[in-house]
Design a protein with these regions (language model features):
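Vicinal oxygen chelate
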Residues: 2-7, 35-37, 55-62, 69-73, ...
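Glycine/charged-rich beta-loop-alpha catalytic/anionic-binding loops adjacent to active sites
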Residues: 83
Length: 144
């Protein structure tokens, strides 16, 4: 897993089980370097049912000035539908920077759509849908 030293904002796509196929297609169109990490290849597999181990935990495509990330839909209580499959992705920086931005964007958000920042095997992770319905994913270094 990679992290930027500074905060970075890129699009983040969510797929319904076909993330690897879609990202491979995008690579064939855009060229560049594609990395795909499946659930089975991460410590997350110990917290997920075996039928989800083939899914993509994180994919990243970078080609010249084009860069975006993606995942297969993994939230057990929400389902993908048009309108919630594209999000903003804030990656990198220090925990305190992520926390400040997360808390600011969470102001007025529907609490049912907020997954607070928490330490995960790959670093800090969190998600929220802001007061306008825009989904934001956060990933970075762990809290000190």
């Amino acid at each position: 897993m990679y992290f930027y030293n500074m905060l970075n904002l890129t699009p983040f796509l969510l797929f319904d089980g076909n993330c690897a196929e879609a990202m491979t297609f995008y690579q064939s169109c855009l060229n560049g370097e594609l990395t795909i990490t499946k659930i089975a290849d991460t410590p997350m597999k110990n917290h997920m049912p075996p039928q989800q181990h083939h899914k993509v935990a994180h994919a990243h495509l970078k080609s010249s000035g084009i860069e975006f990330s993606a995942t297969d839909w993994l939230h057990p209580k929400r389902t993908p539908k048009p309108g919630n499959t594209v999000a903003m992705y804030i990656n990198g920086g220090k925990y305190d920077e992520l926390r400040k931005i997360f808390d600011s964007l969470a102001t007025g958000a529907d609490k049912a759509l907020v997954d607070d920042l928490q330490d995960m095997p790959f670093g800090t992770y969190g998600h929220l849908a802001d007061r306008y319905g825009v989904h934001w994913f956060f990933q970075g270094g762990k809290a000190a």
